């Protein structure tokens, strides 16, 4: 099983590439890699990013966005990695701006997926916060690839457009025994400042 860290966004609201923001004296991407490795679930953890940022990662497995679909958001990142690993059946997706994700969250979502997979024939299993879906923390089967490709080719670039066409299920973030901020994504500098305060409470 492969894990994909989506790190190709422009980060214009944050002011710099969020992958290289720091929490607990680690870059976001390094912290997420460490967490994913601790699960022992993945035979490879891949950073998906754009050509401008690729050389800045001190990491072996970096895939650059497909040249035909650059600057099209998270769908491009997922597509670009899946395209390189068409023999893989399942991918875990996480956005680089979710640095506090925990191994309990990854394991919890995986077990939720396995317990529902056969009965529901699921394509995507991800988290939700109440009624709000969080598709950038989830498991995607390879069966999603043609739908992602079609969406990119037709410039329907929202993940919502894709998962509406597929069999999906959602696990509420409150089901995970982790600090309440584990799934929070960082969009602005004040989000990071707030997160640091919450960690130190």
From Swiss-Prot:
It comes from the Bacteria. InterPro entries: MobA-like_NTP_Trfase, Molybde_CF_guanTrfase, Nucleotide-diphossugar_trans. The keyword DNA repair does not apply. Its EC number is 2.7.7.77. Keywords: Cytoplasm, GTP-binding, Magnesium, Metal-binding, Molybdenum cofactor biosynthesis, Nucleotide-binding, Transferase. Mg(2+) binds at residue 97. It catalyses: Mo-molybdopterin + GTP + H(+) = Mo-molybdopterin guanine dinucleotide + diphosphate. GO terms for cellular component: cytoplasm. It is found in: Cytoplasm. GO terms for molecular function: GTP binding; metal ion binding; molybdenum cofactor guanylyltransferase activity. It holds the Pfam family NTP_transf_3. GO terms for biological process: Mo-molybdopterin cofactor biosynthetic process. GTP binds at residues 6-8, 18, 65, 97. The keyword Nucleotide-binding applies. Its cofactor is Mg(2+). Its main location: cytoplasm. Belongs to the MobA family. The N-terminal domain determines nucleotide recognition and specific binding, while the C-terminal domain determines the specific binding to the target protein. Transfers a GMP moiety from GTP to Mo-molybdopterin (Mo-MPT) cofactor (Moco or molybdenum cofactor) to form Mo-molybdopterin guanine dinucleotide (Mo-MGD) cofactor. This is Probable molybdenum cofactor guanylyltransferase. It comes from Staphylococcus epidermidis (strain ATCC 35984 / DSM 28319 / BCRC 17069 / CCUG 31568 / BM 3577 / RP62A).
């Amino acid at each position: 099983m492969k894990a994909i860290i989506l790190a190709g966004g422009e980060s214009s609201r944050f002011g710099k590439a969020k992958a290289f923001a720091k929490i607990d004296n680690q870059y976001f991407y390094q912290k997420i890699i460490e967490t994913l490795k601790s699960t022992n679930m993945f035979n490879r953890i891949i950073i998906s990013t754009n050509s401008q940022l690729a050389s800045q990662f001190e990491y072996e497995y970096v895939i650059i966005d497909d040249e035909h679909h650059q600057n099209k958001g998270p769908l491009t990142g997922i597509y670009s990695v899946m395209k390189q690993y068409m023999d893989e059946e399942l991918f875990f997706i996480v956005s680089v701006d979710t640095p506090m994700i925990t191994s309990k969250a990854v394991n919890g979502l995986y077990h939720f997926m396995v317990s529902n997979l056969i009965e529901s024939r699921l394509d995507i299993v991800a988290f939700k916060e109440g009624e709000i879906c969080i598709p950038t923390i989830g498991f995607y089967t390879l069966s999603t690839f043609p739908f992602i490709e079609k969406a990119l080719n037709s410039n329907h670039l929202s993940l919502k457009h894709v998962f509406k066409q597929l069999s999906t299920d959602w696990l509420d973030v409150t089901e995970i025994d982790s600090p309440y901020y584990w799934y929070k994504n960082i969009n602005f500098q004040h989000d990071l400042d707030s997160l640091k305060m919450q960690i130190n409470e």
